[in-house]
C-alpha cells in the first residue's frame, strides 16, 4: 500500500520551524504497518516558507519527498516502493499502469506579501514550468491511468472552489474568513483553488486544457478546504 500526503503537515499560521519539523518526523516514525517511504508527499500552503527564505526549505528538510535530507527527515529514497522522477516541486512515479503526477504548492513569485506576512495565504500556485511538465507527462502517457495531485483542487470542481466561496460576508457586508482566511492581497477574489499558474491570476490553465482534452487524466487529488465530506457549498 502507498499513501499520498496532500500537504499542510504544518498546522500553524506562522512560517514553520525546526521544532515543528521534528514533530512531523516523530509522528511519521510511529507508523505501525507502513514505512515512512510508503507516503508520497506534496507541499501545502501552510508548509511554504517565508518569501525571504529559500523556497520551501522547511518542507524539503523535514518532509523531503526526494530523500535529499535523510539526516533530518529520515527518508531514504532507495526504500521507496516505487521510485520517483523529478524534483521536490514536481515529480512522478508509476504503479503498474497508473501514473502519479505530484505537484507542490509554492509562494507566488510575483507577490511581495504572502506566506508569513499573510499567514496561510489561501490561493494555490504552480510555475509555468510545472504546468508544462504536467501537460507533457499527460500527453506522452496516453495509455496510462493518470492521477494528478496538488494541494488545491481546480476551480469550480468541488465544495467552496468558486470565486468568493471560501469566505463570507459579515452583518455589515464586509468579507471575513470562512473556509479560509480572507486575504485580499494574497488571494484575490477569495480564491481558494489553484489560482496562479505561471504568475497569471485566475489562469484557468489546467481547466482549459482538461476541457479541450476530455479524458486525458482520470483523477485529480486535492485537499486544502477544511470541511465535512457531505458539504456542497457552492452547489458542488
Q: Language-model segments: which ranges?
A:
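Active-site glycine-centered loops adjacent to acidic/histidine catalytic or metal-binding residues
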Residues: 7-8, 44-45, 151, 223-224
